[in-house]
C-alpha cells in the first residue's frame, strides 16, 4: 500500500472541494492489507504536518473501534471484514511507542485505540503489553513516563467494572507495577514542574480506577497503604504555586496542581466511604475497614481540616477539591473516632464553610442576570449535583444534624439569628433559609421543631414573596417546596402559601422564580389535602403558565410537574386538553429542532421525551371522552409523523407509546393509515424497536379485528415484521414478543377464516427452534404459537406439521413438537401460558383420530395436565390475592425522631451491611425454585398482551373444558382412556378428582356471577359431585 496515496487522500479530506472523492478513495482502500499499519506510520511521522496526522489518527481510531475484533458471519452471509492479523500484529508492536512519542492531539485518539485493542486482545493475544509497560516505567527517561502511564491507565480501565474473580490478569500485572508507581511518585514529589505534576495526576487516576469498585486486598496491605496514604496527604497538603493565581479563576481547576489534588481527595474519599467504614462494608473488607479507621482516618481528616481552614480564610480552592474534602468529612461524622476529632470544629465548619457555600453568590447573580435560562439549567442539573461543593456541603450539614447531638440545635440557633437580625444581608438570609430547607426532613420529625415550622414560614418566608430581589422570591418558593408536608394549623396560612406561589408562577417577571413556583405549587397540592380545592378555580391559567414555562425553559422537571398536575385535576383539564396538547406539540417541535451535536442536545432530548409522556398522560385522562380523544388524535398524529418521517430514533419508544394510547378504545381510519408508516420505519431503521411497537400492534389485532381482516395487507405487514424478527438478530426478548403476537392473532381470529396464515405462523415459530435458543421463555413462546394453532384447528395444525421440513432434522416435526412440548410443560408459567397448554392438550387428546406419536407418550399426558392445573391453581390464588391487595401502599406517617448518636457511638448500617452480604451471596449462587411464588405471583412479561381467552367474561374455562373432554373420552374411546390413565398412582387420581371438583365449583361460581351481573340472586355453595363421573357441555372449544 503506497503511503503517499493515503497521505494525499487524508489531505483531501480537509478540503471541502476534494473531501467526497478523498473519502471515497479511503473507503475503497481501507480493506487492503497493510492499510491500517500505514495509517499508524503516517500518524507517527514527524515529517508530516499535524492536520494530516490528525486526519490519519481519526481514521485509524474509527477502523480499530469498528473492525478490530473477530466477528462471526451470520448464516448464509459472507464473513464480515476484520483487520487482518498481519496488520493487527504491526499495530500491537508499535502503538505503545506511538502514544509515548506523539503530541497531545494525536495521543488522545491513540489511547482510544489501545483501549479497544486491550479490551479484545489482553491477555489472550497480547501479553507483551505488560512487558512493554514494565520496560518504559523502569526507564530513566522521564519523557516517556506520561505516555506509558496513559497505556497502563487504559489497561486498568478495561478491568475497572469487572468482578473480582475476572480481574486476575490485571492484579497479576499490578503486582509488578504498583511498587514502581509508588517509587516514581516519591521521586517526582521534589520536582515542581507542571509536567511532573501531570505525571503524578496520571498515577492517581490509575490508582483510583484500580480501587473504585473493588479493592484488591492481595495488592494493598497495611504497609504499602501507609506509604500511599502519606503520598496522598502530602499532595493534598502541599501549597499550590503563587503563579497559578495569575490564571483566570474559571480556568484554575484545569491546572495540573488542582487536578492532582482533586484525584488525591477522590481516592481518599473513596477508600473511606467504600472500604474504610466499619459496620458499613461487606464482610471481605471488615479487617481493612478496622485498619483504615484506626490507622489513617483521623490523620487524613486533620489534613482536610486544614483545607477547610484555608477556604474559610478566603484562599482559592478548586470546587472539586472542596467537594471531595466535604465528602470525606461527611463520612467521618458516622464514626466515634473521627467524630471525636471533628466535633470541636463542626460548628466552625457549618458557619464558615457550609453557610457561605449555601448563600447566593456573585457568580449566581452574574448568571441570573446574563442568562437566566442557563441559571435554571445549572440549578436543576443532576450531574451538576454530583460535583457541586454546595451539594456536598448540604449533605454534610444533613448528616451532622441528623446523627450528632446538639448540632441541629446550634445550627438552627445560628440560622434564626440571621433571619431575625434587622437589616441582615439578603444573601445571608438566602443561605440561612437554604440550610433550614435542607434540614426540612429532620425538622418535621422533631417534636421540638415541627410545630414551629408553620410560624417560620409565616414570619420569615411569606414576606420574601414581596422582595425586590428575584433570588429571594425563588428561595421563598424553594422553602415552601421543601416544607410541603408541614401540618398547617391555620387554613389561612395554607391559602396564603398557595396564593403567593400561584402568583409567582403566573405573574412573576423572572423565569427562575416561575420555575421554583411551579414545583412548589405542585408539591403543595400533592401533599396538602385542602390545597387541591383552593387551586381548582385557577387551573386554566396555572396550566397555561406551566405550558409557557416549559416552552421557554425546556426544563424536564417541569414536564413531571405538569404530568402530576394533569393527574390531580383530570376533570378540570379535560375541557382544555386540546389546547394543552396543541401547545405541547408546538413545544416538542421547537425542542427537536436542536441538532444532535449542539450543546445541550441531551437535555433537550430528555425534555422532548417528557413532553411526549405529558401528551400520553393527557390522552389517558380524556380516554372516556370520545370527541376530545378524536381531536387529540389529529394533533398526536402530526407529532408521530414528524418523528417517524424524520427518523428521530431516540423518540421512537415514546411515539409508539402515544400511538398505543390512541388505539386502546378504538382504531380510527387515520390510525390504520399509520400502520404502513410503522411498517416502513421497521424495515428501514426500526428493527430494534419491535418490542416498543408491540403494544400498538397488539391493539391493531385485538381492538379492531374486523378492519385487520378486511384487507390482507394489514395482516401481511404484521406477519412480515414478526417473521423478520424471528429470523434476524433482534435478540430473544424481541423474538418472544414476535411469537406472542403471532399467538395473539391466531387466538383472536379463531373461526374468522385465516386458515391460510396458520402454516406461515407455525413455520416461522418452529423454524426458530431449529437454531440456538438460550432461554426457556423463547422456547415455550415458539411452542405456544403451534399450541394456539392446535386450539384454532387441530387437523390444520397436524397437516401443517406433517408438511414442514427443516434442515438437519430427520425426525418428523409432529413427533418432535409434541415430545418437546411435554418435556417442557413445567416451563410454561403464569395464567395464560398454562391455560393455553391445557386447551391445546385438550384439543389434541379429543381428536377422533389420535396421532400415532400420542400413543408413545400417553403416559406423560395426564401428569402434564396435573402439573399445569396445580400451577394454575396457585396462579389464580396469587392473582386473586393481588386483586384484593389495597392499592394504597403509602407508609404510615412516621413521627419517629431521627436517632442521634452519642459522641462515642458509631453509626452502623446493619440493614445496608446485610443487604451487601445478600447481594454478594446471590452473585455467587443460583437461586432455586423451591418457593413457587417466584413463578406464580406475577404475570409473565408477555401476559400483559391479553388475548380473547383471557377475558374474564369469556366462557373459555379450561377446567370445565378438560372435565367435559375427559368424560367424553371415557365414554367414547375406552381404549384411549385406558392408555391415558393406566400409569396413574393414587395421588395422581386424587388430584384429577380435585380438578373435576374445582371445575364444577368454577362453573357454579360463573353462573352465579352472570345472574348477579344481570340483577339476579347469588347461588349458595354449589353442589359438587363426589364421584369421577363427568358430565355437561364444554364451553369455549367449539
From Swiss-Prot:
Name this protein carries in UniProt: Importin-7
GO MF annotation, one: SMAD binding
Modified residues (N-acetylmethionine): 1
SUPFAM superfamilies documented for this protein: ARM repeat (SSF48371)
Induction remark: Induced by odontoblastic differentiation in dental papilla cells.
Cellular localisation: Cytoplasm; Nucleus
Sequence ranges assigned to domain Importin N-terminal in this UniProt record: 22-101
Organism: Mus musculus
Modified residues (Phosphothreonine): 898
Biased composition (Acidic residues): 884-910
Assembly and interaction partners: Forms a heterodimer with KPNB1. Interacts with histone H1. Interacts with H2A, H2B, H3 and H4 histones. Interacts with SNUPN and XPO1. Interacts with RPS7 and RPL5. Interacts with RPL23A (via BIB domain). Binds directly to nuclear pore complexes. Interacts with SMAD4 and NUP93; translocates SMAD4 to the nucleus through the NPC upon BMP7 stimulation resulting in activation of SMAD4 signaling. Interacts with phosphorylated SMAD2; the interaction facilitates translocation of SMAD2 to the nucleus. Interacts with SRP19.
Record family assignment: Belongs to the importin beta family.
Amino acid at each position: 500500500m503506497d503511503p503517499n496515496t493515503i497521505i494525499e487522500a487524508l489531505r483531501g479530506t480537509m478540503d471541502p472541494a476534494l473531501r467526497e472523492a478523498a473519502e471515497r478513495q479511503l473507503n475503497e482502500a481501507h480493506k487492503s492489507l497493510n492499510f491500517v499499519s500505514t495509517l499508524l506510520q503516517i500518524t507517527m511521522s514527524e515529517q508530516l504536518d499535524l492536520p494530516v496526522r490528525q486526519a490519519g489518527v481519526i481514521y485509524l481510531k474509527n477502523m480499530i473501534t469498528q473492525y478490530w475484533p473477530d466477528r462471526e458471519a451470520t448464516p448464509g452471509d459472507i464473513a464480515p471484514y476484520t483487520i487482518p492479523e498481519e496488520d493487527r500484529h504491526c499495530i500491537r508492536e508499535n502503538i505503545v511507542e506511538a502514544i509515548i512519542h506523539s503530541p497531545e492531539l494525536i495521543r488522545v485518539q491513540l489511547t482510544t485505540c489501545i483501549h479497544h485493542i486491550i479490551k479484545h486482545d489482553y491477555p489472550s493475544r497480547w501479553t507483551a503489553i505488560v512487558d512493554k509497560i514494565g520496560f518504559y516505567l523502569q526507564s530513566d527517561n522521564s519523557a516517556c513516563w506520561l505516555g506509558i502511564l496513559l497505556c497502563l491507565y487504559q489497561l486498568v480501565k478495561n478491568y475497572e467494572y469487572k468482578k473480582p474473580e475476572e480481574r486476575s490478569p490485571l492484579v497479576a500485572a499490578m503486582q509488578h507495577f504498583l511498587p514502581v508507581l509508588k517509587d516514581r511518585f516519591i521521586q517526582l514529589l521534589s520536582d515542581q514542574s507542571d509536567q511532573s505534576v501531570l505525571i503524578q495526576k496520571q498515577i492517581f487516576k490509575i490508582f483510583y480506577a484500580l480501587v473504585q469498585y473493588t479493592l484488591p486486598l492481595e495488592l494493598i496491605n497495611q504497609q504499602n497503604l501507609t506509604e500511599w496514604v502519606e503520598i496522598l496527604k502530602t499532595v493534598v497538603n502541599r501549597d499550590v504555586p503563587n503563579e497559578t493565581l495569575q490564571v483566570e479563576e474559571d480556568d484554575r481547576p484545569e491546572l495540573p496542581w488542582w487536578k492532582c489534588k482533586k484525584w488525591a481527595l477522590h481516592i481518599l474519599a473513596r477508600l473511606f466511604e467504600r472500604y474504610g467504614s466499619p459496620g458499613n462494608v461487606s464482610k471481605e473488607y471488615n479487617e481493612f475497614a478496622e485498619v483504615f479507621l484506626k490507622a489513617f482516618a483521623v490523620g487524613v481528616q486533620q489534613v482536610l481540616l486544614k483545607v477547610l481552614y484555608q477556604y474559610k480564610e478566603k484562599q482559592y480552592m478548586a470546587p472539586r477539591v472542596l467537594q471531595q474534602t466535604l465528602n470525606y468529612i461527611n463520612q467521618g461524622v458516622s464514626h466515634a473516632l473521627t467524630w471525636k476529632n471533628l466535633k470541636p470544629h463542626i460548628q466552625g465548619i457549618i458557619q464558615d464553610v457550609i453557610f457561605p457555600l449555601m448563600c447566593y453568590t456573585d457568580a449566581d447573580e452574574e448568571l441570573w442576570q446574563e442568562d437566566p435560562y442557563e441559571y435554571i439549567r445549572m440549578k436543576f442539573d443532576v450531574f451538576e449535583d454530583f460535583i457541586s461543593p454546595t451539594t456536598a456541603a448540604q449533605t454534610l450539614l444533613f448528616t451532622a444534624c441528623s446523627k450528632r447531638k446538639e448540632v441541629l440545635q446550634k445550627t438552627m440557633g445560628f440560622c434564626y439569628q440571621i433571619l431575625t437580625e434587622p437589616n441582615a444581608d439578603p444573601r445571608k438570609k438566602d443561605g440561612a433559609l437554604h440550610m433550614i430547607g435542607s434540614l426540612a426532613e429532620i425538622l418535621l420529625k422533631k417534636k421540638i421543631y415541627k410545630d414551629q415550622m408553620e410560624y417560620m414560614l409565616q414570619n420569615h418566608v411569606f414576606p420574601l414573596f414581596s422582595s425586590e430581589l428575584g433570588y429571594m422570591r425563588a428561595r421563598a418558593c424553594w422553602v415552601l417546596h421543601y416544607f410541603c408536608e408541614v401540618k398547617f394549623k391555620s387554613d389561612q396560612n395554607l391559602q396564603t402559601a398557595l396564593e403567593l406561589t400561584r402568583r409567582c408562577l403566573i405573574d412573576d417577571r423572572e423565569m427562575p422564580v416561575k420555575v421554583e413556583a411551579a414545583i412548589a405549587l405542585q408539591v403543595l397540592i400533592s401533599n396538602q389535602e385542602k390545597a387541591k380545592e383552593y387551586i381548582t378555580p385557577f387551573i386554566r391559567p396555572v396550566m397555561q403558565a406551566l405550558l409557557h414555562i416549559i416552552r421557554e425553559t425546556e426544563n424536564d422537571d417541569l414536564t413531571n410537574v405538569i404530568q402530576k398536575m394533569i393527574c390531580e385535576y383530570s376533570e378540570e383539564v379535560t375541557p382544555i386538553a386540546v389546547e394543552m396538547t396543541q401547545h405541547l406539540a408546538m413545544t416538542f417541535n421547537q425542542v427537536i429542532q436542536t441538532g444532535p451535536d449542539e450543546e445541550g442536545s441531551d437535555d433537550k432530548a430528555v425534555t422532548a421525551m417528557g413532553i411526549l409522556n405529558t401528551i400520553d398522560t393527557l390522552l389517558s385522562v380524556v380516554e372516556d371522552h370520545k370527541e376530545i380523544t378524536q381531536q387529540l388524535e389529529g394533533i398526536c398524529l402530526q407529532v408521530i409523523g414528524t418523528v417517524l418521517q424524520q427518523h428521530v430514533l431516540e423518540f421512537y419508544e415514546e411515539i409508539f407509546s402515544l400511538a398505543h394510547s390512541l388505539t386502546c378504545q378504538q382504531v380510527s381510519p387515520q390510525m390504520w393509515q399509520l400502520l404502513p408508516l410503522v411498517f416502513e420505519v421497521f424495515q428501514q431503521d426500526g428493527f430494534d424497536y419491535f418490542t416498543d411497537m408491540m403494544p400498538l400492534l397488539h391493539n391493531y389485532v385485538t381492538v379492531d379485528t374486523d378492519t385487520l381482516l378486511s384487507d390482507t395487507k394489514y395482516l401481511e405487514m404484521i406477519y412480515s415484521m414478526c417473521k423478520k424478527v424471528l429470523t434476524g438478530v433482534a435478540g430473544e426478548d424481541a423474538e418472544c414478543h414476535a411469537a406472542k403476537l403471532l399467538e395473539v392473532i391466531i387466538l383472536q381470529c379463531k373461526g374468522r377464516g385465516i386458515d391460510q396464515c396458520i402454516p406461515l405462523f407455525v413455520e416461522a415459530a418452529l423454524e426458530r427452534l431449529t437454531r440456538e435458543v438460550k432461554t426457556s421463555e423463547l422456547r415455550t413462546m415458539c411452542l405456544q404459537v403451534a399450541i394456539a394453532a392446535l386450539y384454532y384447528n387441530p387437523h390444520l395444525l397436524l397437516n401443517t406439521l406433517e408438511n414442514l421440513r427443516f434442515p438437519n432434522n430427520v425426525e418428523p416435526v409432529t413427533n418432535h413438537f409434541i415430545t418437546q412440548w411435554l418435556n417442557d410443560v413445567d416451563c410454561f408459567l403464569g395464567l395464560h401460558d398454562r391455560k393455553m397448554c391445557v386447551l391445546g392438550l385438550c384439543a389434541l387428546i379429543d381428536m377422533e383420530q389420535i396421532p400415532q406419536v400420542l400413543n408413545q407418550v400417553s403416559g406423560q399426558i395426564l401428569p402434564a395436565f396435573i402439573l399445569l392445573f396445580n400451577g394454575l391453581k396457585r396462579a389464580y390464588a396469587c392473582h386473586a390475592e393481588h386483586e384484593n391487595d389495597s392499592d394504597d401502599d403509602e407508609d404510615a406517617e412516621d413521627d419517629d425522631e431521627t436517632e442521634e448518636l452519642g459522641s462515642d457511638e458509631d453509626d452502623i448500617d446493619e440493614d445496608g451491611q446485610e443487604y451487601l452480604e445478600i447481594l454478594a451471596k446471590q452473585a455467587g449462587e443460583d437461586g432455586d425454585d423451591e418457593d413457587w411464588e417466584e413463578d406464580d405471583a406475577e404475570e409473565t412479561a408477555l401476559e400483559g398482551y391479553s388475548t380473547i381467552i383471557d377475558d374474564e367474561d369469556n366462557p373459555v374455562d379450561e377446567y370445565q373444558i378438560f372435565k367435559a373432554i375427559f368424560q367424553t373420552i371415557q365414554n367414547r374411546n375406552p381404549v384411549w382412556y385406558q392408555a391415558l390413565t393406566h400409569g396413574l398412582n393414587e395421588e395422581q387420581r386424587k388430584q384429577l378428582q380435585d380438578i373435576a371438583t374445582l371445575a364444577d365449583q368454577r362453573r357454579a361460581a360463573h353462573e352465579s356471577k352472570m345472574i348477579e351481573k344481570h340483577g339476579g340472586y347469588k347461588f349458595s355453595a354449589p353442589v359438587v359431585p363426589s364421584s369421577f363421573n363427568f358430565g355437561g357441555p364444554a364451553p369455549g372449544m367449539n
